[in-house]
Amino acid sequence: MNYFPWLTIIVVFPIFAGSLIFFLPHKGNRVIRWYTICICILELLLTTYAFCYHFQSDDPLIQLVEDYKWINFFDFHWRLGIDGLSIGPILLTGFITTLATLAAWPITRDSRLFHFLMLAMYSGQIGSFSSRDLLLFFIMWELELIPVYLLLCMWGGKKRLYSATKFILYTAGGSVFLLMGVLGVALYGSNEPTLNFETSVNQSYPVVLEIIFYIGFFIAFAVKSPIIPLHTWLPDTHGEAHYSTCMLLAGILLKMGAYGLIRINMELLPHAHSIFSPWLMIIGTIQIIYAASTSLGQRNLKKRIAYSSVSHMGFIIIGISSLTDTGLNGALLQIISHGFIGAALFFLAGTTYDRIRLVYLDEMGGIASPMPKMFTMFSSFSMASLALPGMSGFVAELIVFFGIITGQKYLLIPKILITFVMAIGMILTPIYSLSMSRQMFYGYKLFNAPKDSFFDSGPRELFLSISIFLPVIGIGIYPDFVLSLAVDKVEVILSNFFYR
């Protein structure tokens, strides 16, 4: 057990420091912005220091463990710990949240509340990734939803109330199943109810009961991921949310669903996952094709990017269901890769809207000439999204492909069919991605329009875009930097499917 509470400080610090925003002197929004950015930078530095000097990547066991008794009545503990599976998403959360606060610089209305909600969301996300107690995981999961709902309601577009209501109905409905699964696992199989994740992992369940638990957890995580047909909240939410909120949604929130599938459905319930994995493989394949085809028909720029996110999540589902080291490592790499790329695309879409005040692609065109920097950055991230070699998306999708081909669970003909359909999906990706760039930047619709508001990217936008682009290129050139974090943990998880 760790004697210095690194993880507790990392989880609590953002929301605690964020609550002090309301006590800052009224000296304009600039003080609040810089205060929030400093908190995020300090948190990211603290996290990086703790992981660099106190985390050993070659150890698959839980590290930096903290266990404090909280409520004696039903053995509820404040229990935190990290392993190779959670370190990547936690660092991604810190990086994207820091950049999202910088992206939110133009926000002036109710600035204190806005930045507090972003920091509260930060704590909830890190708490979810580091929880080793099932009920604590559920509490952190819910803590992260409330700020998103308020950010949507108060700083969204014209249809923000509809989108926020749809978001909360879907996610709250999924949370009911999550709570039922948590309580079911806690109450089964021991004289005293336990919420300890380590104890639950070593517990054996009857197959029927394990399937019931699996379905409950799967519904909760399928809403968040999202997995079709529980994805319809996502395009509406992205279409109305402020682009800094979209960065957090695409970069982190969707990845929480994928993390939950691996952490709970796969690690906690391996027998049920083995039964359901062929169906997950089919769903993931359909999702890639369906979302890519639907994205092509979207007029709204942000909705087109949202459907592209749904399509890319299909690769993660396929990697999780492949039951191979290679496939699962590819899924984890895709989680990190798409976290960067999705956040960047939504940021650039939002900053473009700030300049031209248009959101429909068929009304755009010809803005490459007055905004060459914006054109260059958007084109670069579009290339990353369509998995151009040398960028992180290419490596992640290629590893998922190898995971399916080398898997022993599936017969040769199904593997060939799935690979063929996935390849079709990869062909559709450049079609909708490149057509999006063509409609925005080429043509003549806005070519002769007054250029007063068509100012190009400033230092803030350039810094933010380059900060995201560097890890996309870095992971594409040297993916082992990310893969080495989780490779031992992946072997431990998959050993349950063959030796348990």
Curated annotation (Swiss-Prot):
EC number: 7.1.1.-
InterPro entries in alphabetical order: NADH_Q_OxRdtase_chain4, NADH_Q_OxRdtase_chainM/4, NADH_UbQ_OxRdtase, ND/Mrp_TM
Superkingdom in the source lineage: Eukaryota
GO molecular function: NADH dehydrogenase (ubiquinone) activity; ubiquinone binding
The UniProt record lists the keyword Transmembrane: yes
Transmembrane portions of the chain: 4-24, 35-55, 87-107, 113-130, 134-154, 167-187, 208-228, 242-262, 272-292, 305-325, 330-350, 386-406, 411-431, 462-482
A GO BP annotation: electron transport coupled proton transport
Main location per the UniProt record: plastid
GO cellular component: chloroplast thylakoid membrane
Keyword set, alphabetical order: Chloroplast, Membrane, NAD, NADP, Plastid, Plastoquinone, Quinone, Thylakoid, Translocase, Transmembrane, Transmembrane helix
Short name of any one Pfam family annotated for the protein: Proton_antipo_M
UniProt similarity note: Belongs to the complex I subunit 4 family.
HAMAP family xrefs: NDH1_NuoM (MF_00491)
Protein name: NAD(P)H-quinone oxidoreductase chain 4, chloroplastic
